[in-house]
Amino acid sequence: MVYDGAVKDQESSANPASASAALSEASAAASEVTAAAAAGAGAGAAEEGAAVSGRPPRPPHDKRLGVRHPLKHRRFRAGGKVMVEPGDPPSAQEVADEEASEVEQEAAPVEREPPQEEGGDVEVSSAPAEMEVVEGDAMEVSPEPAVAVGESELEGRPGEEEEVSSPVVSQGERKQETAAAAPVPAVEEKKHKDQENKHKEREREKERERVDEVGYMSGGWKSEDGFLSCGYSSFRGKRASMEDFYDIKSSKIDDKQISLFGIFDGHGGSRAAEYLKEHLFENLMKHPEFMTNTKLAISETYKKTDSEFLDSESHTHRDDGSTASTAVLVGNHLYVANVGDSRAVISKAGKAIALSEDHKPNRSDERKRIESAGGVVMWAGTWRVGGVLAMSRAFGNRLLKQFVVADPEIQEQEIDDELEFLILASDGLWDVVPNEDAVSLVKIEEEPEAAARKLTETAFSRGSGDNITCIVVKFQHDKMDGDSSPTSDKS
């Protein structure tokens, strides 16, 4: 049983004679209990006493350790040897012992711990609560961890909660900050590449949003020497999304002017076509034999880019693909490569000449190749590989890759005065506009951009239900020395 200090003081002042008698009587009883407890405890009590005495004494003003715990309240006496269950009335002997110990404690000199400097570290112990139990003193123990704080903090900021920070945690945070301040070069390089890729992705997203919003975009370009001028037009048409992409590049390698033009028509999604736009020409110009053996470089680059795309998509469940119809101008030689059903057509001496043949499953040579590889060509609205894909060659298409390859067919054409212009277009144009009609429409327009727009508008008016994208390249034989400048996109 625990008595409040204020109540004891009031009782002592009210009856000093009875308090003196109780003190002498309690002292005699306490000495008897002490002797009995020491004899019963033996060596164990001696060791426990030694361990307890090694700890600093509890500050006498700290009354928190004697407060009754709301959930567990057992009273311990003489190191825990005598316990009283909650609700049991204390005996007269226990009351006398408690009064005697409290009187002795109040009479004993107070030893204060040296005050801790304001703002000093707060030591936190996660060990179970421990305290020094004075023999004959009955008190209740809270199982909460013991926290040692400075007296100045308790007295200077009463009732204020102190935020306790672990020095171990602070040290770990400092180590993390140090590691972040000195990044590894490889990590920096990867971070830079990630930022660059994110920037490119944002630009591509803006372009897609623009096409999806207006459904139409076009533009033009001229070479520095004035020999080439080209225009492009891309129209979403009746489709809900845009899966056609185009690419135009110009560069100088070994003092030779290099120009590259490409149409990429995606199916089952836009990922493959977009990948080709970003990587196909870049890989081609890096090929070691690009200038010396251009045909070999194109063939190997097509296969390499297809393999890299499949690797990049290995973690996904998509299986989209794309065509590729490209024209590469190196000096006075034009190389046209094709995979799929996009097409390249030139106008030479006023005649329409196809420089590529569509890769369709109903082509006798393509059907024989597919069946020799173990594939099947069947009719499903049109002739399809495995009843699924309506073209016999393509980039991507992992599930049909054994039969649907990305090996290009390449045609070489020498540039002479009879070569007037080149048309590259997706099947959204060629399905409704024959080669001869396309050539006739381009002849009417002087500017290649206007000609490209004319082709897409004609295809749409004739009922094309696909995306429509085309590039028109005109060879200006009479303007070899003329000035030129790029033109901006229009929509």
From Swiss-Prot:
Residue ranges of every copy of the PPM-type phosphatase domain listed in the record: 229-475
Keyword Magnesium listed: yes
Binding site residues for Mn(2+) 1: 265-266
CDD domains in alphabetical order: PP2Cc
Superkingdom of the organism of origin: Eukaryota
Biased composition (Basic residues): 66-78
Catalytic activity: O-phospho-L-seryl-[protein] + H2O = L-seryl-[protein] + phosphate; O-phospho-L-threonyl-[protein] + H2O = L-threonyl-[protein] + phosphate
Key words, A-Z: Hydrolase, Magnesium, Manganese, Metal-binding, Protein phosphatase
Residues the record lists as binding Mn(2+) 2: 265, 427, 466
InterPro entries named in the record: PP2C, PP2C_BS, PPM-type-like_dom_sf, PPM-type_phosphatase-like_dom
Keyword Magnesium: yes
PROSITE patterns, per database record: PPM_1, PPM_2
Cofactor: binding details: Binds 2 magnesium or manganese ions per subunit.
Biased composition (Low complexity): 12-54
Bias-annotated ranges (Basic and acidic residues): 1-11, 187-211
Ranges of biased composition (kind: Acidic residues): 95-105
Listed GO biological process terms: signal transduction
EC number of this enzyme: 3.1.3.16
Gene Ontology MF term list: metal ion binding; protein serine/threonine phosphatase activity
Cofactor: Mg(2+); Mn(2+)
Region feature (Disordered): 1-211
Family from the record: Belongs to the PP2C family.
Entries under PANTHER family matching the protein: PROTEIN PHOSPHATASE
Protein name stated in the entry: Probable protein phosphatase 2C 52
